Amino acid sequence: MRYYQKLVSLLVLVLAASFGVGGCVLLYSDFAVQRGRMATANAAAHAQTCTLLQTEILDLQRRGTTMDDAALTARVEARDTPAALWRGDTLICATLPGLENFSLENAATVTVRTEESVYAVYASDLQGGLRLVTAYDLTGLYRDRDAALTRFLLLEAAVLAAAAAVT
């Protein structure tokens, strides 16, 4: 192999590596921005769900309706959001399998990965010793990130293969 071919090969390799690292950094920074936006939106949705449920409970109590576990379960199940309701350490209801395992503290936020899905789980205390735990599906966000990274790496491999064929 001639000197200029070695030099060109080395240059292509260095450029490919730098573009590869730069592309991955861009993909992950974009993912971080999207994840932050989702976290903000999910936190707002959780706060709204807490406010609406608390308002319903207070309204029913004001009318003299007793809020037993069945009434609370009906209120939680009426929501479109997967949720679990706790009274102290006692689970009242859970609308998503697995949420009964998350007796989180007030204002806690965790990201949970199951075999098939990724969820952002939020917890907040309500009046009367109740704690509402809600879950928001992030599976699509993580799936899109993985697909973009796969496409990028395949493109990077194709560029390296083309460069190898040319040199």
Positions of PLM-derived features:
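Juxtamembrane membrane-water interface segments immediately C-terminal to a transmembrane helix
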Residues: 28-57, 148-151
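Extracytoplasmic/periplasmic helical hairpin
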Residues: 49-99
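Juxtamembrane loop-transmembrane helix junctions in multi-pass integral membrane proteins
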Residues: 2-6, 144-147
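Membrane-proximal, non-catalytic sensory/regulatory domains of signal-transducing membrane proteins
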Residues: 96-131
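Extreme N-terminal signal-anchor transmembrane helix of membrane signaling/transducer proteins, especially
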Residues: 3-29, 157, 161-162
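Membrane-interface helix-start motif
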Residues: 136-156
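Inter-domain helical "communication" segments and dimerization helices
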Residues: 83, 97-106, 138-139, 149
